[in-house]
Swiss-Prot record:
Organism: Leishmania major
Highest taxon, organism lineage: Eukaryota
Region (Disordered): 57-80
Protein name, UniProt field: Heat shock 70-related protein 4
Molecular function terms from GO: ATP binding; ATP-dependent protein folding chaperone
Length: 228
């Protein structure tokens, strides 16, 4: 197995990719030179645009631009989904009992699940090979702490479809704690750590302990509509 691994953060508003190499993490710039990529996927008559590419095409129909996908809800009748749908420019419909997104793509009406769209973002963020000069396939993908099993599996599937070997799906606050602990390997005894993860659209708080390199989550809570 390669000793170099991706760490991909598919966020609500921005996504980024880091590479763990030589005991440290480097955040990789995208093809626009930015270290974070807008979490947008847009569809035109001829192509699919991801991230910064969508921002340069501001004149494209907003109904074909999908965002806010970290707010994945598997049940279409949930009040929070119904509320969000009033503000989204894109259309959400029911297919096989689950909400999917309907867009006009290549002159056809097509539907995509969150996993389908996550694949595009993962594929875009997974391109660390150009930075390293070698192919990197192993990846760890972080998700909000409140994600359930089906949401985590959808994220893992998206990475696999993008050609990545997804080693683990871990909570974003846990990833932050691991990064904190990496710089304090010499610390003795048990430490209590409180992680505040305020993102562009979600908020998580996690309480955990660190002792001898072992991380144990004691409690976690969050708000899926608090961020900015």
């Amino acid at each position: 197995m390669s000793s170099t691994k991706h760490r991909i953060d598919l966020g609500t508003t921005y996504s980024c990719v880091g590479v763990f190499k030589n005991e440290q993490v480097d955040i990789i710039a995208n093809d626009q030179g930015n270290r974070t990529t807008p979490s947008y996927v847009a569809f035109t008559e001829t192509e699919r645009l991801i991230g910064d590419a969508r921002r340069t095409r501001w004149h494209e129909p907003p109904g074909n631009t999908v965002f806010d996908e970290a707010h994945d809800r598997p049940q279409v009748r949930r009040p929070d989904l119904q509320s969000d749908m009033k503000h989204w420019p894109f259309k959400v419909i029911v297919k096989d009992g689950k909400p999917v997104i309907s867009v006009e793509y290549q002159n056809q009406t097509k539907t995509f699940s969150r996993g389908d769209l996550g694949y595009g973002a993962a594929e875009n963020e997974g391109d660390g090979g150009g930075y390293l000069g070698t192919t990197v396939k192993d990846a760890v993908i972080t998700v909000p702490a409140y994600f359930n099993d089906s949401q985590r599996q959808a994220t893992k599937d998206a990475g696999s479809i993008a050609g990545l070997n997804v080693l683990r799906i871990i909570n974003e606050p846990t990833a932050a704690a691991i990064a904190y602990g990496m710089d304090r390997k010499g610390d003795k005894g048990e430490k209590n750590v409180l992680i505040f993860d305020l993102g562009g659209g979600t908020f998580d708080v996690t309480l955990l302990t660190i002792e001898s390199g072992v991380f144990e989550v004691k409690a976690t809570a969050g708000d899926t509509h608090l961020g900015g």
